[in-house]
Amino acid sequence: MPTTRQCSFCGHEIPPGTGLMYVRNDGTMLWFCSSKCRKSMLKYHRDPKKYKWTTRYMKVR
């Protein structure tokens, strides 16, 4: 049975058969639910805690 993965950037669950797997040079695997998450992490180096649409969002006092 296929397993659901969790997006490495936003934290949302990825249904089986969708998403993108990115493998770094050191062998770690990153799973992304959309190109928005992939670009935010790899291209723009954004912090997921600062964006409300992620599950890792934390309000800063």
Curated annotation (Swiss-Prot):
Where does this protein hold Zn(2+)?
7, 10, 33, 37
Give the cofactor note. Binds 1 zinc ion per subunit.
Task: Return the GO cellular component terms, semicolon-separated.
Answer: ribonucleoprotein complex; ribosome
Query: Keyword Zinc: yes or no?
Result: yes
**Gene Ontology terms for molecular function:** rRNA binding; structural constituent of ribosome; zinc ion binding
Subunit structure, interactors included: Part of the 50S ribosomal subunit. Forms a cluster with proteins L3 and L14.
Family listed: Belongs to the eukaryotic ribosomal protein eL24 family.
Cross-referenced Gene3D superfamilies, in alphabetical order? Ribosomal protein L24e
The UniProt function text for this chain reads: Binds to the 23S rRNA.
Give the residues annotated as coiled coil.
Answer: none
PANTHER family linked:
60S RIBOSOMAL PROTEIN L24, RIBOSOMAL PROTEIN L24
Per the UniProt record, the lineage of the source organism begins with: Archaea, Thermoproteota, Thermoprotei, Sulfolobales, Sulfolobaceae
Kindly give the SMART domains that the UniProt entry links to this protein: TRASH
Report the superkingdom from the record. Answer: Archaea
Oxidoreductase recorded as keyword: no
Q: Which Pfam families match?
A: Ribosomal_L24e
Q: Which cofactor does it need?
A: Zn(2+)
Q: Give the organism, scientific name.
A: Saccharolobus islandicus (strain M.14.25 / Kamchatka #1) (Sulfolobus islandicus)
**Where are the annotated C4-type zinc-finger regions?**
7-37
* The entry's keywords: Metal-binding, Ribonucleoprotein, Ribosomal protein, RNA-binding, rRNA-binding, Zinc, Zinc-finger
- One of this protein's GO BP terms? translation
Tell me what this protein is called. Large ribosomal subunit protein eL24
Q: Which InterPro entries match?
A: L24e/L24_sf (IPR038630), Ribosomal_eL24 (IPR056366), Ribosomal_eL24-rel_arc (IPR055345), Ribosomal_eL24-rel_N (IPR000988), Ribosomal_eL24_CS (IPR023442), TRASH_dom (IPR011017)
